[in-house]
């Protein structure tokens, strides 16, 4: 260590140094470094004050004078090996496995080079961004991603903002060809401020795309002017983004916003995962597993795609893309559309009139109470950024409670000649559908807007309508319990019929036995829709089993025992 060696191919002397970067277990434990062509070697060179000698041109040909000048890098490497062999200096050639950087599209080997670049000094700019998170003014959802944010900021280096690309925002720096003076200006100067020369050219580099992206929250609003848009929209509330660009985008927006405006650009960062293919692989052009969202939209609709991306999606977690899930979302959209069309067809026959809550039947109050609770649950989960859970609750309510149960319950009333009960059913159907559409709208905006505008005339668009809120007067706990009792009995009857292979078209007499008079009263008040849902020719309520055939098939629920005579 400390001695000088002579490079046989150039006759130039280089020093022998010792550094902890060298892996003593790899190869001989000795390695020649190139500070101008490797990022790790560059750091070693800085520590030991080594000269940075660039030997390549931008087209990857050799630039240093001598035999190899102008040769392609691959050819030059082969020629150097042959020359060392002829000089008797080549001991052996041993293949080693190591990481080689390649272009992500064409696979060409990337050759690192030292180039003059533009940098932003980050040490002082990072401190306010760190303090913003630690003080609570900025938060991450999930909270664990705040550690990623701090990890990058607390170990941040100066930011290289220049890129050698053909497109992008040009760096506003101008050079005088006469004296070499550099000028940074908003507009291109006509003359050099130093020598008065008129021969100037702009820096050929472009800005890092994340530099302009970091300014996006306020630069799009007229900043640095205090425009109405800037005053209203900045800072915003929530940024939704992927965990893979916390460093590239989120951090840079935060420190840029604080530096330029004195304010964090948002108070919450909601992190989502990546959409991967069905095998769990990241979608990429090189793998050819990418899916064009426009193709999905053409086949299934934008709403189905939006719902698919939100279903079962927890903040920060990756999701796998399955076509079956898109089909399921499309089927749900069809379910909503068909149910809405059924309701609107009945409304056309008998326009909806206002109905007092006291005029509603048990099933009406039940579904009104359920959608009331749904509004509360969905809002609470959205406030916690549990968007997937909120969507699942809306899905379950619309598909099961509203479509499969309530609409089927009220069909006999819609066909009834009795105006009062029909009016209550129509008012409830319309009211609950509107509430459901509003809760579904963030996930399926197009179909909900279309249905909403055709369903009512009071509001021009669902987008500017009021968000559903919990109402105490819509809380009907007793009716909820009562209808659950009926639903349990219906499930029991259907289970018996399925086990006996009785088709829905064949009606059968049903006995409901309970010693509790309140339970029998529930069935008495819901006899019609209970018979409809249970495919019963008659519903008989009694306190005991007397008169029921011994061979009757039975099913026990929490509140009653259901019998269906075998002969029936």
Predicted regions and their residues:
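NTP-handling and nucleic-acid-processing catalytic cores
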Residues: 1-59, 128-162, 191-196, 219-234, ...
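Residue patterns forming the tRNA-binding/recognition surfaces of aminoacyl-tRNA synthetases
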Residues: 2-4, 12, 21-177, 249, ...
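Active-site palm subdomain of RNA-directed nucleic acid polymerases
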Residues: 46, 52, 257-263
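Short, conserved secondary-structure transition motifs
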Residues: 101-106, 243, 273-277
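Short microdomains enriched in Cys/His and/or Lys/Arg
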Residues: 110-117, 124-133, 197-222
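Feature 926 captures the class I aminoacyl-tRNA synthetase adenylation module centered on the KMSKS loop
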Residues: 151-211, 215, 259-302, 317, ...
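A short glycine/serine-rich beta->alpha loop
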Residues: 233-244
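Short Ser/Thr-interspersed hydrophobic loop/turn segments at strand-loop and sheet-helix junctions
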Residues: 249-259
């Amino acid at each position: 260590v400390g001695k000088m060696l002579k490079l046989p191919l150039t006759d130039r002397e280089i020093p022998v140094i010792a550094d902890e970067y060298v892996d003593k277990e790899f190869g001989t434990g000795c390695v020649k470094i190139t500070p101008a062509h490797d990022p790790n070697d560059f750091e070693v060179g800085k520590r030991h004050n080594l000269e940075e000698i660039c030997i390549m041109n931008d087209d990857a040909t050799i630039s240093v004078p001598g035999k190899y000048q102008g040769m392609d890098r691959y050819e030059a490497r082969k020629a150097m090996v042959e020359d060392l062999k002829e000089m008797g200096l080549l001991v052996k050639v041993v293949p080693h496995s190591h990481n080689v950087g390649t272009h992500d599209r064409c696979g060409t080997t990337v050759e690192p080079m030292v180039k003059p670049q533009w940098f932003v000094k980050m040490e002082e700019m990072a401190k306010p961004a760190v303090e913003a998170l630690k003080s609570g003014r900025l938060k991450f959802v999930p909270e664990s991603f705040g550690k990623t944010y701090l990890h990058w900021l607390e170990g941040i280096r100066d930011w290289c903002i220049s890129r050698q690309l053909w497109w992008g925002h040009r760096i506003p720096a101008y050079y005088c060809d006469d004296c070499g003076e550099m000028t940074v200006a908003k507009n291109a100067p006509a003359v050099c401020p130093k020598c008065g020369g008129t021969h100037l050219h702009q820096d050929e580099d472009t800005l890092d795309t994340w530099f302009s992206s970091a300014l996006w929250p306020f630069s799009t609003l007229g900043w640095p002017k205090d425009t109405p848009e800037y005053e209203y929209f900045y800072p915003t509330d929530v940024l939704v983004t992927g965990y893979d660009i916390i460093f590239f985008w989120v951090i840079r927006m935060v420190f840029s916003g604080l530096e330029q405006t004195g304010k964090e650009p948002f108070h919450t960062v909601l992190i989502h995962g990546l959409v991967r293919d069905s095998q769990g692989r990241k979608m990429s052009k090189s793998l050819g597993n990418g899916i064009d969202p426009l193709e999905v939209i053409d086949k299934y609709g934008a709403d189905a795609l939006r719902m698919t991306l939100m279903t079962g999606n927890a903040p920060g977690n990756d999701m796998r893309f399955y076509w079956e899930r898109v089909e399921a979302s499309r089927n749900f959209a069809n379910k909503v559309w068909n149910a809405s069309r059924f309701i609107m067809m009945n409304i056309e026959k008998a326009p909806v009139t206002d109905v007092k809550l006291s005029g509603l039947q048990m099933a009406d109050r039940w579904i009104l109470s359920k959608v009331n609770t749904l509004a509360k649950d969905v809002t609470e989960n959205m406030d916690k950024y549990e968007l997937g859970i909120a969507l699942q609750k809306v899905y379950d309510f619309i598909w099961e409670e509203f479509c499969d149960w309530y609409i089927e319950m009220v069909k006999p009333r819609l066909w009834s000649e009795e105006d009062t009960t029909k009016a209550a059913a129509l008012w409830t159907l319309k009211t609950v559908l509107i509430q459901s559409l509003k809760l579904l709208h963030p996930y399926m905006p197009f179909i909900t807007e279309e249905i909403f505008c055709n369903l009512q005339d009071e509001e021009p668009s669902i987008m500017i309508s009021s968000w559903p809120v919990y109402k105490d007067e819509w809380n009907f706990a007793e009716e909820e319990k009562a209808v659950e009792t009926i639903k349990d009995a219906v499930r029991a009857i259907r289970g018996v019929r399925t086990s006996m292979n009785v088709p829905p078209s064949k009606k059968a007499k049903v006995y409901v036995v309970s010693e509790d008079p309140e339970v029998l009263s529930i069935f008495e008040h819901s006899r019609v829709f209970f018979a409809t849902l249970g495919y019963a020719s008659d519903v008989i309520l009694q306190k005991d089993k007397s008169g029921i055939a011994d061979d009757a098939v039975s099913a026990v629920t929490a509140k009653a025992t259901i019998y269906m005579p075998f002969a029936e």
